[in-house]
């Protein structure tokens, strides 16, 4: 969905977009939500499936990068050591990471009876942002059933904005949440896709830049002063055959997209990036010691860097433009950028 067709003419980048302009333009990638929206409870769970097969037995090459480590994401140590992803990726609020991890382990055990019986354990990946501004986070309202519901909801045409894990998030002082975008890159005459998904909960209103325009110059509305703390989680997916080293290089370029929207990655903000490719899969069991893989030549990687920057920038803006105004805990309200733009004098 991205920000295509917005009524203000905002455009990001020059590369062609995917059909949906979402991370799900990468074949096999799907996303699902479970949203809790009831008074002081404004939170939820978002799940991302890297492909439609058995992710434990068909792992995907992956990498991570920590821009600023004020965060509690689980599973990154093994991703960085082994270079693979073997579970869906979950997103939720900070204090629900434990619940989400337990649920994800149960989900994987049900699908893979060999785990901790005839083979080793599993590495659940759970990402988080702190939604305590809108959500009664101390109430621990997310349950394992909510996680299972998000996993069951995974589909290519998923919602963006104040949904799932994004329900209680604030981005640049406005209502943030889930955002996504994609770009198409041609290599050796064949089209490939780069996609991004963000959970945005970071940065300052006065710094917000929308497609090159400082947004405070368009709005007369006063946004209450706030600290630059929170987090943003970024996941990159592609069907381009890459190594884990190359995926880590892509992760580092996410910062380019974040900076284009005005973020400087403050002290209290956790900027975590995970990237994976569906092209190179690693079987959990293999009769052969050597595995054949196709890899991109590094001299051809620049268009991918551009695609990452554009996808991440647009994903942040998409999370803002698709989110409605939400009032939650302690009567706090985070306002919708779209509504503010429509109502501006």
Question: Model-flagged regions — what are they?
Answer:
Residues 1-345:
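Alpha/propeptide regions of enzymes that mature by internal proteolysis
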């Amino acid at each position: 969905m991205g920000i295509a067709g917005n009524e203000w003419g905002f455009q990001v980048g020059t590369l062609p977009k995917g059909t949906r302009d979402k991370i799900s333009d990468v074949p096999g990638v799907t996303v699902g939500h479970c949203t809790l929206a009831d008074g002081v409870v404004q939170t939820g769970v978002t799940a991302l499936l890297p492909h439609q097969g058995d992710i434990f037995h068909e792992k995907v090459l992956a990498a991570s990068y920590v821009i600023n480590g004020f965060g509690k994401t689980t599973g990154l140590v093994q991703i960085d050591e082994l270079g693979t992803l073997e579970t869906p990726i979950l997103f939720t609020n900070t204090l629900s990471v434990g619940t989400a991890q337990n649920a994800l382990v149960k989900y994987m055990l049900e699908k893979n009876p060999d785990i901790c019986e005839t083979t080793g354990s599993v590495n659940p990946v759970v990402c988080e942002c702190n939604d305590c501004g809108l959500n009664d986070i101390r109430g621990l309202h997310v349950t394992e059933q909510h996680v299972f519901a998000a996993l069951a909801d995974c589909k290519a045409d998923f919602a963006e904005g104040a949904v799932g894990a994004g329900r209680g998030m604030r981005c640049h002082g406005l209502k943030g949440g889930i955002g996504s975008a994609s770009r198409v890159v041609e290599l050796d005459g064949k089209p490939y896709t780069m996609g991004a998904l963000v959970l945005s909960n970071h940065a300052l209103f006065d710094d917000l830049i929308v497609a090159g325009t400082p947004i405070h110059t368009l709005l007369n509305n006063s946004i209450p002063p706030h600290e630059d703390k929170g987090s943003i989680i970024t996941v990159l997916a592609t069907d381009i055959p890459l190594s884990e080293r190359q995926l880590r290089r892509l992760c580092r370029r996410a910062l380019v997209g974040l900076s284009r929207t005005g973020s400087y990655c403050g002290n209290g903000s956790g900027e975590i990036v995970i990237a994976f490719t569906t092209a190179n899969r690693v079987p959990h069991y293999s009769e052969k010691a050597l595995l054949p893989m196709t890899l991109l030549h590094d001299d051809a990687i620049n268009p991918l860097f551009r695609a990452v920057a554009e996808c991440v920038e647009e994903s942040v803006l998409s999370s803002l433009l698709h989110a409605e105004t939400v009032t939650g805990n302690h009567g706090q309200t985070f306002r919708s950028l779209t509504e503010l733009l429509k109502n501006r004098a």
